[in-house]
Amino acid sequence: MRQAEITRNTLETQITVRLNLDGTGQGKYATGVPFLDHMLDQIARHGLIDLDIEAKGDLHIDAHHTVEDIGITFGQALAKAWGDKKGLTRYGHSYVPLDEALSRVVIDLSGRPGLELHVEFTRAVIGTFDVDLVGEFFHGLVNHAGMTLHIDNLRGKNAHHQAETIFKAFGRALRMAVTPDPRMAGTMPSTKGSL
């Protein structure tokens, strides 16, 4: 079973992430950041992973530490769940539209953390959610999952739609990248022999 549970406790946050890469898209979220809960649900549903995230953070200051640390813990859980990566597809990509918005996400489970995030949100806040936190979440995730991630919002006028297409496309690209390829069973998906 490709499952993981990671708990991360700091002076700023206490976070537990449980996930199953071979799930059905079920999720439970108690982060204290409602818009992030909505975005995490997009990852789970479109990635077909079961995801349970509990977080307590210093939200009396703002959501920065909580969102970043959820990304870190989620990345650690992903790395633990996919293990040595033998037999995985490794690469994943997706285009997702939502009305006027369109985003493209491309993933490489390379072991080399890197984020290329290209989005110009049409407003600075979605509800009470600072759009800068989208980048903080994905930076934390890629650094601890060891993946290269390219995110491009190709168009969009509604900031909620821009964010939602990014998270949906990430879920779908992740699903592709972590899918076992039966022709690669037991084989590392790299000419170097390691990732």
From Swiss-Prot:
Keywords: Amino-acid biosynthesis, Cytoplasm, Histidine biosynthesis, Lyase. It is an enzyme of class 4 (lyase). GO terms for molecular function: imidazoleglycerol-phosphate dehydratase activity. Its main location: cytoplasm. InterPro entries: IGPD_sf, ImidazoleglycerolP_deHydtase, ImidazoleglycerP_deHydtase_CS, Ribosomal_Su5_D2-typ_SF. Belongs to the imidazoleglycerol-phosphate dehydratase family. This is Imidazoleglycerol-phosphate dehydratase.
